[in-house]
């Protein structure tokens, strides 16, 4: 979340910065709430001081044998007023917290202006688009020949799920193993295995709650004594990995921290009506290899550039043409200050499709998580900066491999870097 101190000092400047991403809030109402909070806080402190003074007076009166009935009544009256003042202060603070938690992050100055994905800027392209001399199929038609089965998934779970068997299941696994090995052995990430169910605090920490609850799958665990515990299926591996460091003070010598994890991701995609949903592109359950970095404030934007190249490295190794997009302010994710999307070319559909989103959050998540380090020079605790990116979305990478490496006879050429994971197989027939 945004700094409350920053809001108090220059609320109008924050409001103007958020207008860049077409987010508006009632500045006057928040100023009024903040004014009331200050008044109630002062009143609470004054009442607390008065009660303490009266309590000390009771002690002195007792010691000298004086009547303390009037003093006891004063303390009782002050306690009643103090409890009321504390209650009012808590209500005001809760209302402020709700507003602040609903505020997105402020875009970095380098982020292009714009309202929607149509205003995003292409930064670069890699790879040549093949001019096929045969009728190109999309991954749904190709996948059906190799064990990709949507009908069985509908029988088991409903729409937007998939079943894979045989060679295509092995190719999906090979992609995952290759990504994990590349990131851990070449790019310097520590592999992490994490829970797929997380609590409310974890999702608040990384910014999915309270704003995006409709996109999450929620579970209820009923205890023997009738109590109910709520857990959510993770929408991305970023959530449990980043929360590993919640409420921690990291040693400066241990920075930067770099983690890679492979998890399923679960999303209701409540807002996807009318968007492309054919095949594996937009599923309720899909797998990703996720990259997370925790760095000092001064290092975060250089880290974003490097993290993005780690995702690009996978695409290049798999010989998949792609483009790098800088998201405009209006298209940024809620917690991000700057984001690069990598979009892979899908010849079977004649479109570029997002396959990785790499973002810097500055201290937005760290403030919620209380993720800090002790600065050796100042000897003060400072918030860290967090970043994450997909390295890559496994299902969409499978789609890209099928469509880009298809041959005229409908066989699939296996990229060289995957062949050792496929038992030496060079072509999938």
UniProtKB/Swiss-Prot annotation:
Keyword Electron transport recorded: no
Enzyme Commission no: 6.1.1.11
One biological process term in Gene Ontology: selenocysteine biosynthetic process
Record's comment describing the protein's domains: Consists of two distinct domains, a catalytic core and a N-terminal extension that is involved in tRNA binding.
Source species of the chain: Vesicomyosocius okutanii subsp. Calyptogena okutanii (strain HA)
Function text: Catalyzes the attachment of serine to tRNA(Ser). Is also able to aminoacylate tRNA(Sec) with serine, to form the misacylated tRNA L-seryl-tRNA(Sec), which will be further converted into selenocysteinyl-tRNA(Sec).
Lineage: Bacteria, Pseudomonadati, Pseudomonadota, Gammaproteobacteria, Candidatus Pseudothioglobaceae
Subunit: Homodimer. The tRNA molecule binds across the dimer.
Pfam families, alphabetized: Seryl_tRNA_N, tRNA-synt_2b
Subcellular location: Cytoplasm
Annotated residues for binding of ATP: 267-269, 354-357
Gene Ontology CC terms: cytoplasm
SUPFAM superfamilies: Class II aaRS and biotin synthetases (SSF55681), tRNA-binding arm (SSF46589)
Protein name: Serine--tRNA ligase
Similarity remark: Belongs to the class-II aminoacyl-tRNA synthetase family. Type-1 seryl-tRNA synthetase subfamily.
Pathway entry: Aminoacyl-tRNA biosynthesis; selenocysteinyl-tRNA(Sec) biosynthesis; L-seryl-tRNA(Sec) from L-serine and tRNA(Sec): step 1/1
């Amino acid at each position: 979340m945004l700094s409350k101190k920053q809001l108090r000092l220059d609320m109008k400047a924050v409001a103007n910065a958020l207008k860049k991403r077409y987010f508006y809030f009632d500045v006057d109402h928040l100023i009024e709430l903040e004014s009331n909070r200050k008044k109630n806080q002062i009143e609470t402190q004054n009442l607390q001081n008065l009660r303490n003074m009266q309590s000390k007076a009771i002690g002195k009166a007792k010691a000298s044998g004086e009547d303390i009935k009037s003093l006891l009544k004063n303390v009782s009256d002050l306690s009643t007023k103090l409890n009321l003042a504390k209650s009012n202060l808590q209500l005001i603070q809760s209302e402020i917290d709700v507003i602040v938690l609903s505020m997105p992050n402020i875009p970095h100055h380098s982020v292009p202006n714009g309202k929607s994905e149509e205003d995003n800027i292409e930064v670069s392209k890699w790879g040549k688009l093949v001019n096929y001399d045969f009728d190109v199929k999309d991954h749904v038609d190709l996948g059906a020949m190799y064990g990709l089965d949507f009908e069985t998934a509908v029988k088991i779970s409903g729409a937007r799920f998939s079943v894979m068997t045989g060679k295509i299941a092995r190719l999906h696994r090979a992609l995952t193993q290759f990504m994990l090995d590349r990131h851990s052995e070449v790019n310097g990430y520590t592999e992490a295995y994490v829970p797929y169910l997380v609590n409310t605090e974890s999702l608040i920490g990384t910014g999915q709650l309270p704003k995006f609850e409709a996109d999450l799958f929620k579970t209820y665990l009923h205890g023997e004594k009738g109590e109910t515990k709520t857990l959510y299926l993770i929408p991305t591996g970023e959530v449990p990995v980043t929360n590993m460091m919640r409420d921690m003070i990291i040693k400066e010598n241990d920075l930067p921290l770099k983690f890679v994890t492979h998890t399923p991701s679960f999303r209701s995609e409540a807002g996807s009506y009318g968007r492309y949903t054919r095949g594996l592109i937009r599923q309720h359950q899909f797998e990703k290899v996720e990259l997370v970095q925790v760095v000092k404030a001064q290092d975060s934007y250089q880290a974003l550039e490097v993290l993005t190249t780690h995702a690009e490295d996978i695409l290049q190794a798999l010989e998949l043409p792609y483009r790098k997009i800088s998201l405009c302010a209006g298209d940024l994710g809620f917690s991000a200050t700057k984001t690069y999307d990598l979009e892979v070319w899908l010849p079977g559909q004649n479109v570029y499709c997002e396959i990785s989103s790499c973002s810097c959050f500055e201290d937005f998540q760290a403030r919620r998580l209380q993720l800090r380090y002790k600065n050796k020079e100042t000897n003060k605790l400072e918030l860290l900066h967090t970043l994450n990116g997909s390295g890559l979305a496994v299902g969409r990478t499978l789609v890209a491999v099928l469509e880009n490496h298809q041959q005229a006879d409908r066989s699939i050429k296996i990229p060289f870097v995957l062949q050792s994971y496929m038992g030496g197989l060079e072509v999938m027939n």
